[in-house]
């Protein structure tokens, strides 16, 4: 058996490191370097470059292509141009560094100083696309074959410049002719220079040497301010100053007063207030990549640029997507509030006529519409949040209405109930204390009170014709005004109105339910219960017991709740009559009527036991004595005894004046007597039997008659006072002296 030897293949020492494979990027870059070395490193040109290549003189042979090496210490002479290079030799950079360096900075420069230079980079699109551009100074490599540079290049020290970049010399006609390749400078309309305005002299003379200059391109030059260009470019309409280290556009109005297009991208401009100097002509402004960050300056400057159509502000701090600007109302408006809007909306509001913003067409119709609205109202503010809240509020209101709850309708119902309630001063204990609890709920779909009353009246008329109430005018059926819901305890009152023929006419209207109020000390114990009848008679006085004839209560009336009807003729003035005749005017205001009735009843309660003495004083006056015959005729002859026992007041009229008054004017006392008779006459609209107990019915009738007598007393006193003073107007009770042409057709109003 043979022995087998097992060898240990494991390494006893550190393994050698595997060579690192080049990354795909390096392989791609290496292949690109070889490809560029084979065909030239700046062979791909823009359309303008290819056009010039076909004409010849712009692209050199491949042997003249630039080298990536740099030898600053060598001296090379190209034709008539001296190139001073240092003797030192730098190491050749890596291929990756070379290709990136060549792709970013290497320009294709013209062989002739007057030819235009064009970038050989693939990126030929910029804000000034189609126009030749120059590279920045100091970033141009030497030719790679024999250290030579293309024609038109000169370098000194470590800086390589184009021969058209003039340094340290004055601007002369010869220099301008050489740069523009035109012998007649006065006919030049466009020019392109790359100049160092820090070392050049007489730069301001360019405007005088080329007066017809229409377009001037100074990209990649060294210009700190536009003031160095001079003034009086009378025909200059387009100006390019991109990448020129410009920090201010001050003096643009003096430099180019008719400027229409300004391309000033990639500078250090932070203040654009000077653009307002050319606001009448400026239409295009390119300020990309500057240092504009003040929104107040934009709000102050942009609205003045009325003809602006194209604006580029991207690349500035103010145009950042996170930037939020604050707007406020004009200083003239009160209640200033700050609101926040975005940058794009700010520009849209400040410039309503703007068509392009940041190379994008403004197509948002809502933004344009809101901007036009703000322009119309001279305000630069629209709050989208407010519009959103308004729409949501309308939607919520619509949902509430669909659910059946209408807060507006409910509040309106409460207001109606509150306005239709009145103080309970006459029938405190007789009215129910559950009026609010028994009040029907508000329903918009339910018929109105008038419609329900007419329907109920028509049904009651059809069932029994005798139960219909008869009115005072022709005996027509009068609908019973009854509220829907629980029956309210009300009263019925008829008021006569003077018509054209002199006949009284009564109308009926229901008063709203009485509102519950706490009983005052003066009205305590004034209930209408049968047990309080004696107490009420003592308070009313002996004169009222004689003046008021008892009305027998209706035997057929049952205990129940009374209804109330009232006319629209409150006691608020006097009706016209010939001479000095006073009568009550007719008004249709229920509120005034209610207040008058309440005041008359409260006046009776406050007087109390003194009513007898006041009535005796009135009956002893001259006016009352002159009406003895009328009182006897009207059935109130029992009052003559009181008239004979009363003495004359000190201020009474003399007998002659009283006789004259008796002849000219039918007295109010006579009207009072006729009123009492009319209340008892069945044919002229009597008080109907109330739906209550006989005692309560009689009590209510007595109170009504008492109020009529008190009102007539007040009227007589006012008439007497007017006669004594001899004036045409009386300040008491709203009385007015009027005259009428026909005494026979007008008679006092009868209640």
From Swiss-Prot:
Keyword presence, Repeat: yes
Q: Where is the composition biased (Polar residues)?
A: 28-39, 60-87, 456-471, 662-671
Q: Does the keyword Repeat apply?
A: yes
- Taxonomically, which superkingdom? Eukaryota
> What InterPro entries would the database entry show?
Leu-rich_rpt (IPR001611), LRR_dom_sf (IPR032675), LRRC56 (IPR040091)
What family does the database annotate?
Answer: Belongs to the LRRC56 family.
* Feature: compositional bias, Basic and acidic residues: 717-738
Name the SUPFAM superfamilies for this protein: L domain-like
Q: What is this protein called?
A: Leucine-rich repeat-containing protein 56 homolog
Q: Where are the LRR repeats?
A: 210-235, 236-256, 258-279, 280-304, 307-328
Location in the cell reads: Cell projection, Cilium, Flagellum
Q: Which UniProt keywords apply?
A: Cell projection, Cilium, Cilium biogenesis/degradation, Flagellum, Leucine-rich repeat, Repeat
Ranges where the record places region Disordered: 1-149, 430-538, 645-698, 717-751
Write out the function statement from the record.
Answer: Required for the assembly of dynein arms in the distal portion of flagellum axoneme.
Effect of gene disruption?
Gene knockout results in significant reduction of flagellar beating and cell swimming, and absence of outer dynein arms in the distal region of flagellum axoneme. Cell motility is characterized by an erratic swimming pattern with altered propagation of the tip-to-base wave, increased frequency of base-to-tip waves, and frequent tumbling typical of outer dynein arm mutants.
User: Compositional bias (Pro residues) spans?
Assistant: 13-22
Q: Which GO terms describe its cellular component?
A: ciliary membrane; motile cilium
């Amino acid at each position: 058996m043979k022995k087998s030897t097992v060898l240990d293949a494991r390494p006893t020492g550190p393994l050698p490191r595997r060579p690192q494979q080049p990354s795909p990027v390096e392989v791609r870059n290496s292949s690109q370097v070889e490809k560029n070395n084979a065909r030239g490193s700046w062979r791909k040109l823009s359309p303008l470059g290819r056009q010039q290549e076909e004409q010849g003189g712009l692209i050199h042979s491949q042997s003249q292509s630039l080298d990536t090496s740099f030898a600053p210490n060598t001296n090379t002479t190209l034709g008539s141009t001296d190139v001073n290079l240092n003797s030192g030799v730098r190491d050749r950079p890596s291929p990756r560094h070379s290709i990136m360096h060549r792709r970013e900075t290497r320009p294709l420069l013209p062989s002739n100083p007057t030819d235009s230079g064009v970038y050989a980079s693939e990126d030929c699109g910029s804000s000034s696309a189609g126009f030749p551009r120059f590279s920045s100074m100091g970033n141009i490599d030497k030719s790679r074959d024999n250290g030579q540079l293309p024609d038109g290049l000169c370098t000194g020290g470590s800086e390589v410049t184009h021969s058209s970049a003039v340094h340290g010399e004055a601007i002369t006609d010869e220099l301008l002719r050489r740069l523009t390749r035109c012998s007649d400078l006065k006919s030049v309309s466009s020019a392109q220079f790359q100049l160092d305005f820090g070392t050049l002299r007489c730069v301001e003379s360019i405007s005088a040497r080329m007066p017809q200059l229409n377009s001037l391109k100074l990209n990649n030059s060294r210009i700190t301010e536009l003031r160095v260009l001079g003034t009086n470019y009378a025909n200059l309409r387009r100006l390019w100053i991109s990448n020129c280290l410009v920090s201010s556009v001050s003096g643009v109005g003096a430099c180019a007063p008719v400027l229409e297009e300004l391309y000033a991208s990639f500078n250090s401009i932070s203040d654009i207030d000077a653009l307002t100097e050319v606001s009448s002509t400026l239409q295009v402004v390119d300020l990309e990549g500057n240092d504009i960050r003040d929104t107040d300056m934009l709000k102050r400057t942009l609205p003045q640029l009325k003809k602006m159509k194209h604006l580029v502000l991207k690349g500035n701090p103010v145009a950042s997507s996170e930037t939020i600007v604050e707007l406020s109302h004009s200083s003239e408006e009160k209640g200033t509030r700050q609101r926040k809007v975005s940058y794009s909306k700010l520009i849209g509001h400040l410039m309503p006529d703007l068509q392009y913003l940041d190379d994008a067409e403004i197509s948002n119709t809502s933004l344009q519409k809101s901007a036009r609205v703000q322009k119309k109202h001279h305000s630069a503010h629209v709050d989208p949040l407010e519009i959103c809240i308004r729409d949501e509020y309308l939607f919520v209101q619509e949902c509430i209405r669909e659910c059946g709850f209408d807060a507006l309708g409910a509040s309106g119902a409460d207001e109606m109930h509150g306005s239709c309630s009145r103080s309970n001063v006459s029938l405190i204990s007789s009215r129910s204390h559950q009026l609010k609890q028994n009040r029907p709920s508000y329903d918009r779909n339910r018929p109105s009170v008038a419609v329900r009353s007419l329907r109920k009246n028509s049904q009651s008329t059809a069932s029994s014709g005798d139960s219909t109430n008869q009115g005072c005018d022709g005996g027509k059926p009068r609908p019973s005004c009854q509220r829907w819901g629980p029956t309210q305890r009300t009263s019925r009152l008829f008021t006569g109105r003077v018509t054209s023929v002199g006949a009284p006419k009564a109308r009926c209207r229901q008063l709203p339910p009485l509102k519950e109020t706490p009983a005052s000390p003066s009205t305590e114990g004034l209930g209408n219960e049968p047990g309080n009848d004696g107490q009420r008679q003592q308070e009313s006085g002996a004169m009222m017991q004689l003046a008021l004839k008892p009305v027998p209560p209706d035997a057929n009336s049952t205990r129940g709740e009374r209804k109330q009807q009232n006319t629209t003729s409150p006691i608020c003035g006097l009706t016209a009559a010939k001479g000095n005749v006073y009568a009550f005017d007719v008004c249709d205001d229920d509120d005034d009527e209610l207040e008058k009735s309440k005041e008359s009843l409260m006046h009776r309660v406050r007087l109390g036991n003194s009513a007898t003495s006041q009535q005796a004083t009135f009956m002893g006056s001259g006016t009352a004595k002159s009406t003895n015959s009328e009182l006897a005729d009207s059935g109130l002859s029992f009052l003559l005894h009181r008239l004979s026992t009363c003495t004359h007041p000190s201020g009474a009229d003399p007998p002659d004046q009283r006789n004259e008054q008796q002849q000219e004017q039918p007295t109010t006392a006579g009207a009072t007597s006729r009123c009492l008779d009319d209340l008892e006459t069945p044919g002229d609209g009597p008080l109907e039997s109330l739906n209550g107990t006989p005692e309560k019915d009689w009590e209510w009738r007595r109170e009504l008659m008492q109020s009529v007598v008190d009102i007539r007393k007040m009227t007589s006193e006012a008439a007497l006072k007017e006669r004594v003073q001899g004036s045409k107007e009386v300040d008491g009770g709203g009385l007015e002296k009027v005259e009428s042409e026909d005494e026979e057709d007008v008679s006092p109003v009868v209640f």
